[in-house]
């Protein structure tokens, strides 16, 4: 809607979600030939832990080459791959040589790899943080690594501690397969901060529907709905509500998000950089108790959600 307002004469090409989803499934099938430990990051991105696969398929670099080759043969698409000791370094490496690159960060060479890169390459260092760091004389990741972590924490708060660890190549997060995840979430980061409450609400509703659709696909209804808000100054808050029963109904998730939005952001004047919606507390959707009216409503939700899912996959 915003793009149309800014560029009323632009030609907009409708997305083909069903095609994207099918190609994503093909690529995911290639990943799972080499490891069951696959954590989707987006339709076209994922983290793979191939630690236990080396005896069968060779070292990580060889597995990466094979995956690139098989994706090209089966989908006619190129892929950029980063091979590294942890998730942060692997993601950074994969971004350095798009669209058809292969970057290997050897164990023990993290410092040499990171040293010359601009500090903006670190997750969470946006324009404002980069400006603060630049005023401190910090231009590269190497510059950042040489700054005392305590001083960074004074300047940037807990965010400073986090980026200090990343600057030293430290990232302890495990690769979490989708089926083992304790929550389902979607979030979006805006190129420009969003200030209008109605625009924030529209984004949260869209994210809630994405989460509900994914939960239905995974057959993982949940009781706890959460919103995540990152403001322009990188302060991040989360707010959650626990429902009476587990659900993956789009209507119920939208209602929960509306409630959380009204409580925290309905009158917000602060610009927002990121919004997210999550679902957790997985249980049995059939555990819902209620009268005939609630069961009729549940049946209607199921029908509507089926229509929504088919429409989402089609368009």
Model-found features: residue ranges?
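Surface-exposed, charge/polar-rich loops and edge strands
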Residues: 112, 186, 283
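Short loop/turn motifs enriched for small/polar and acidic residues
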Residues: 51, 84-86, 230, 278-282
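Gly/Gly-Pro- and Ser/Thr-rich, intrinsically disordered tail segments characteristic of DNA damage-repair
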Residues: 1-162, 175, 213, 296-315
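Short, hydrophobic beta-strand segments
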Residues: 46-52, 238-241, 288-294
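Short Gly/Ser/Thr- and Asp/Glu-enriched loop/turn motifs at secondary-structure junctions
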Residues: 41-45, 84-87, 220-224, 270-274
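DNA-contacting surface of Y-family translesion DNA polymerases
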Residues: 121, 129-272
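Acidic, metal-coordinating catalytic segment for phosphate/diphosphate chemistry
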Residues: 245-315
């Amino acid at each position: 809607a915003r793009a149309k307002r800014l560029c009323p004469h632009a030609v907009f090409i409708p997305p083909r979600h069903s095609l994207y989803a099918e190609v994503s499934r093909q690529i995911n099938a290639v990943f799972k030939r080499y490891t069951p430990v696959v954590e989707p990051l987006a339709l076209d991105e994922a983290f793979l832990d191939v630690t236990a696969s080396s005896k069968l398929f060779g070292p990580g670099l060889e597995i990466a080459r094979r995956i690139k080759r098989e994706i090209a043969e089966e989908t006619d698409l190129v892929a950029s791959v980063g091979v590294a000791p942890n998730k942060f370094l692997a993601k950074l490496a994969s971004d350095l040589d798009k669209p058809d690159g292969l970057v290997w960060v050897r164990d023990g060479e993290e410092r040499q790899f990171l040293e010359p890169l601009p500090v903006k390459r670190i997750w969470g260092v946006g324009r404002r943080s980069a400006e603060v760091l630049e005023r401190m004389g910090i231009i590269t990741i190497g510059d950042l690594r040489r700054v005392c972590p305590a001083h960074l924490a004074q300047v940037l708060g807990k965010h400073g501690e986090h980026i200090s660890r990343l600057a030293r190549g430290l990232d302890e997060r495990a690769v979490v397969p989708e089926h083992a995840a304790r929550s389902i979430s979607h979030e979006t980061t805006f190129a420009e901060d969003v200030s209008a409450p109605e625009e924030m609400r529209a984004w949260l509703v869209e994210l809630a529907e994405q989460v509900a659709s994914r939960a239905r696909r995974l057959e993982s209804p949940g009781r706890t709905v959460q919103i995540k808000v990152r403001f322009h100054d990188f302060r991040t808050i989360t707010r959650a509500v626990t429902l009476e029963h587990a659900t993956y109904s789009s209507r119920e998730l939208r209602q929960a998000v509306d409630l959380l939005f009204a409580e925290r952001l309905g009158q917000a004047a602060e610009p927002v950089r990121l919004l997210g919606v999550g679902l957790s507390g997985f249980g049995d959707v059939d555990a819902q108790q209620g009268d005939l009216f609630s069961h009729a409503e549940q049946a209607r939700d199921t029908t509507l959600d089926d229509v929504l899912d088919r429409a989402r996959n089609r368009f």
